[in-house]
């Protein structure tokens, strides 16, 4: 469904999910993915979205783990942090807990794991924070580094940007029980581009951006 010439302004990310979750009296365990390119604001959005709207208090963040392992050079322990994060995800899934994690979606390996979780009764909810270009992603990461945050090599950012969008289109949107695609070009004015899910009719609020992201013909 296209809602022409309208882009819904999000004062905060809680409003993105209210229509999806407010009517669910009894909810199954859920895995929530906060996705988007490097520098898109995933970690910044996590607190209000997860603790506020979704009531999910288990957020596995490999970047935070890396900082805990090596505060001044987290990039040096990225592999080890990733291994610890994956182990924690498996632990939470085995405990049938609801949990969340962030990713650029540049890896395809989450898809079969998510399918397996869904087969056991889990629901998969996806929130993708979109940026219009890899160049903006690079600029956001550079800004983060100037503020004391962790760096990501430029070539890695570009690879993840394209790979994440490709996998979003072909793997993760078709798999999600619910998905929200959010324009985070302006951090003070996030806008909902489109939403939908397995049993939720897709609604497109910004047709031009939707066609651009999904590579649809005009």
PLM feature spans:
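Phosphate-binding P-loop
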Residues: 23-28
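Conserved lysine of the Walker
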Residues: 42
């Amino acid at each position: 469904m296209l809602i022409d010439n309208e882009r819904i302004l999000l004062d905060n990310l809680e409003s993105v999910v209210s229509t999806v979750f407010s009517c669910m009296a009894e909810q199954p365990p859920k895995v929530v993915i906060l996705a988007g390119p490097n520098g898109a604001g995933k970690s910044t959005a996590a607190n209000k979205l997860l603790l506020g709207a979704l009531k999910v208090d288990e957020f596995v963040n490999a970047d935070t783990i890396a900082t805990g392992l090596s505060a001044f050079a987290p990039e040096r322990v990225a592999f080890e942090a990733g291994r610890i994060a994956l182990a924690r995800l498996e632990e939470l899934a085995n405990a049938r807990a609801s949990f969340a994690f962030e990713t650029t979606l540049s890896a395809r390996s989450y898809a079969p794991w998510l399918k397996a979780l869904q087969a056991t009764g889990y629901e998969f909810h996806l929130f993708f924070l979109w940026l219009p270009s890899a160049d903006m992603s690079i600029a956001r990461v550079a800004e983060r580094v100037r503020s004391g945050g962790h760096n990501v090599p430029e070539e890695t950012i570009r690879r993840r940007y394209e790979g994440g969008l490709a996998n979003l289109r072909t793997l993760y949107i078709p798999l999600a029980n619910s998905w929200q695609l959010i324009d985070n070009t302006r951090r003070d004015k996030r806008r909902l581009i489109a939403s939908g899910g397995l049993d939720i009719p897709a609604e497109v609020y910004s047709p031009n951006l939707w066609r651009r992201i999904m590579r649809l013909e005009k």
